Amino acid sequence: MRLDFWSKIRDVPVEDLIFLDEAGVNLAKVRLYARALRGQRARGTRPQKRGKNVSMIGALALKGVVASINILGATDGLTFEAFVIQKLVPNLWKGATVVWDNSTIHKGQEIEQALREAGVQLIYLPPYSPDFNPIENFWSKVKNTLRSLGARTYQALDLAITKAFSQVSFKDIRNWFAHSCYCILPI
């Protein structure tokens, strides 16, 4: 299946690839590592209540984040469909190729029809292949930034997510695409 994926995607220009995925965060994000003086324990506080999860949906292209949204709670099929139709499709261009995993919320006739009408190709990642999806690295950096910012309210978390997105550089994105085996010519 992984070979079939590469045979479908190999002729698509890397500039036309858009990777989409969801990630979840909550109010209990804290740093995982700390420093202290020799012989002393590093201390910090961690909230006992995590609160509701905040789902982030994002679409990443070589030129940056194409569309994103934060939702309090889990993402279901209707929420995902609304994101694709209202946020993603207006930002797409003819000849673009959207790539996402095989999650059941990604499969809907309305979603596929909206992408077809926009002149966009849809390719599903093979099962168990997050290594082919550069947005996984994007979410990793966003979550690490959120850990260091330590937002403890939903309003602060929303601002922290915006700040974490702005911390991602074009160099980061280029490197994530290259790491996921999408050939990029040097600048």
Regions found by a protein language model. Give the residues of each.
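RNase H-like two-metal-ion nuclease catalytic core shared by retroviral integrases
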Residues: W100-N102, Q109, I123-R147, Q155
